[in-house]
Amino acid sequence: MMSNTLPEQSVNTTLAPLPGQPDYPATWPADALNCAQIKQHLDAFQQWLGAAFDDGYTAEQLIEARTEFIDQLLQRLWIAAGFGDTPDTALVAVGGYGRGELHPLSDIDLLILSRKRLSEAQAQKVGELLTLLWDVKLEVGHSVRTLEECLLEGLSDLTVATNLIESRLLIGDVALFLELQKHIFSDGFWPSEKFFAAKVEEQNERHQRYHGTSYNLEPDIKSSPGGLRDIHTLQWVARRHFGATSLREMVGFGFLTEAERNELDECQHLLWRIRFALHLELNRYDNRLLFDRQLSVAQRLRYEGEGNEPVEHMMKDFYRVTRRVGELNQMLLQLFDEAILALTTDEKPRVLDDDFQLRGTLIDLRDETLFIREPQAILRMFYMMVRNRDITGIYSTTLRHLRHARRHLKQPLCYIPEARSLFLAMLRHPGAVSRGLLPMHRHSVLWAYMPQWSHIVGQMQFDLFHAYTVDEHTIRVLLKLESFAKEETRAKHPLCVDLWPRLSHPELILIAALFHDIAKGRGGDHSVLGAQDILKFAELHGLNSRETQLVAWLVRHHLLMSVTAQRRDIQDPEVIKQFAEEVQTENRLRFLVCLTVADICATNETLWNSWKQSLLRELYFATEKQLRRGMQSTPDMRERVRHHQLQALALLRMENIDEEALHHIWGRCRANYFVRHSPNQLAWHARHLLRHDLSKPLILLSPQATRGGTEIFIWSPDRPYLFAAVCAELDRRNLSVHDAQIFTTRDDMAMDTFIVLEPDGSPLSPDRHEAIRHGLEQAITQRTWQPPQPRRQPAKLRHFTVETEVNFLPTHTDRKSFLELIALDQPGLLARVGQVFADLGISLHGARISTIGERVEDLFIIATADRRGLNNLLQQEVRQRLTEDLNPNDKV
């Protein structure tokens, strides 16, 4: 005889409503079970959820209330559909709904379970029930399976098996449901060890999709490492092996201490609060904390502050919680490993010294009180991990003792002399970062060692440029630096691999990297504050004067090379001379270029490309030459022109060109043209110009990458708005301009060179060349300038603001002005800048384009029509026009 009594695993259907809560479905009259009224009740309940959350009810209370609400609704509808007294059928909650975790937009996953296939009439009833649920706008996922089908599907599909393991009977045949439970918890259905191994592999694959870190600036609350899924993994494994249905029951089985349970509860509470608030802000299910949602979620959670401070406070809490979850997850899965797979329990540990032993490949304490008695032993353990490649991690019980000792430290570890000696010895070892600093960071020992580190843990930056939090970025800088010692890195970073063995004391660059962003988030110039911090570190750790000066200089100037290469005219000898004067020595230069490359690569994986590589190489070798030549020496312009012409001529003579015609063309060009192009570029231009009718436009696209990008060369009668027209066409084709050299011959022909890249930072695909050439021909031959129709701003930029800044930089000449533009990146920006210059009768001679996330930081070399720098009045007019044009009142 079938019973409608629910088993003990079910949510209590007598859960009392919270004050002000709409009635539960169990109390509705029978005539309320129609589409219109159900939807009305659901809408009222959803609105109440938001109001109740804002009034201070916890996410736990409201999740329980929503789960109960949906439970009762489904029970009523199941009976109304005619299944109330039908044997051998059951309605089962699975997945997150089975766990009783229904956030405002969570899917409602259902299993319609039967002993044998449903009859046609039953199938029709199920279809009508599901249609009603969809009509009232519930997000319902469902499967209709027999008991046998459940077991067969579950055996072949880990996701199905997991859903079944956390299934919960809503209504129906209890005996049928218990039979399902009996089968899925039997040894024949996903044995415990097989299930554990599969879930660990699944978690590892999921972590890889997020680059192994929860510290992405737009994390997924559920799936990012350290997120809710990592807690679920622990629950699934414990449920399958121990039968534990809650964290509290895991304590009873001895695999979780009460303190660890409380910690996981705290972490889950914060993650649930953020996820609940996010769902209230959205209309469609999503668990990603994207930039455009972060501020509204933070404000809903009552984080305070000006501007983006609420976001930074919320995200710092989020990242710190995911760090704790990640560490607990690692430790507890290892404990499960020992209990379930029994891989190491029978192995006799190998003694390493008086304090440590090796269990398999994991380092283990021989005396569990060691870290409390001798805190410096914590550093001894990590130093041993650095020196011994056999050690791949920390044994679970030792990790538990480490966590306990870490919480009971009376002072930072760096105040202990032996700990300082061990830390420096670790930094001098080739595996210092990957086998020492990285695990120290993961287990919050870097925080325990350096008080300053605590300030940047979880510190985010609300922009599109930085992909990681400050601490995660710093660790990635350190890992990149360590990679320069490996030959396999040469293909991507040949210069740094060449320079690494020539660094005097490579540990110094690791110290500089640790501190280069340590002062972010404190207010003020983080480079200056970081340099002050490193002086204290150097004194405490006994660095000598020369070493101290080097690391402090590197921190103070860690942005110098990047800014100079990307935002200054590095083909100007004066720029090179000023940079060399700042650097002073070749040793500093070697350190700085390695730190700069690592910093760029670790900021955002999309930033590093062959264009940036070419800029830094060019700046490095030009500076090295300047340092060897001496500060008083500057290259002679006429000699450089002559040298480039002779080398280009040598290349062309191999092709039997008409030298008289060549000299006629070159005679029309000004000196700057020869200085700012390589002999190969000069030969390439000349080769095509000699075969061309010079009265007509010529457009060339380089077949191979030039300085990391594709070079576009344009020969055309000069006219106003030419630069604007070219940039508008390139923007229309979604190409990024990174460099422009604008020249006009003595008889007013434009000779313009653009370095362009695809959006992903690669040179242009050859199959696009012809279409781009044709588009540019049309653009430059138009008789009148027609500003392009403004395009919509990309969605990812709409929630960022960057105030437009126009700065005129100091210059050593009165023949040109250097304009630095900082503005919000936006479609058609270069064309609009070019239009302003043309409107004001200003000639553009060069441009260096740098896009940093949502910001553009561009350099323009400009002059008046009579080749003079801009006076104060004209500078002010340019500043006003650019500010007005790039800060429109209504963004499209």
From Swiss-Prot:
Regulation: Uridylyltransferase (UTase) activity is inhibited by glutamine, while glutamine activates uridylyl-removing (UR) activity.
Annotated spans, Uridylyltransferase: 1-351
Keyword Thylakoid applies: no
Annotated segments matching region Uridylyl-removing: 352-710
Domain ACT: 711-790, 818-892
InterPro entries: ACT-like_dom_sf, ACT_dom, HD/PDEase_dom, HD_domain, NT_sf, PII_UdlTrfase/GS_AdlTrfase, Polymerase_NTP_transf_dom, UTase/UR
Example GO molecular function: [protein-PII] uridylyltransferase activity
SUPFAM superfamilies: ACT-like (SSF55021), HD-domain/PDEase-like (SSF109604), Nucleotidyltransferase (SSF81301), Nucleotidyltransferase substrate binding subunit/domain (SSF81593), Poly A polymerase C-terminal region-like (SSF81891)
Location of the HD domain: 470-592
Keyword terms, alphabetized: Hydrolase, Magnesium, Multifunctional enzyme, Nucleotidyltransferase, Repeat, Transferase
A single BP term in Gene Ontology: regulation of nitrogen utilization
The enzyme's E.C. designation: 2.7.7.59, 3.1.4.-
Region (Disordered): 1-20
Cofactor(s) in the UniProt record: Mg(2+)
CDD domains listed in its UniProt record: ACT_ACR-UUR-like_2 (cd04899), ACT_UUR-like_1 (cd04900), HDc (cd00077), NT_GlnE_GlnD_like (cd05401)
Catalysed reactions, as listed in the record: [protein-PII]-L-tyrosine + UTP = [protein-PII]-uridylyl-L-tyrosine + diphosphate; [protein-PII]-uridylyl-L-tyrosine + H2O = [protein-PII]-L-tyrosine + UMP + H(+)
Gene3D superfamilies with a match to the protein in the record: Hypothetical protein af1432
Pfam families in the cross-refs: ACT (PF01842), GlnD_UR_UTase (PF08335), HD (PF01966), NTP_transf_2 (PF01909)
Similarity section: Belongs to the GlnD family.
Domain notes: Has four distinct domains: an N-terminal nucleotidyltransferase (NT) domain responsible for UTase activity, a central HD domain that encodes UR activity, and two C-terminal ACT domains that seem to have a role in glutamine sensing.
Protein name, UniProt field: Bifunctional uridylyltransferase/uridylyl-removing enzyme
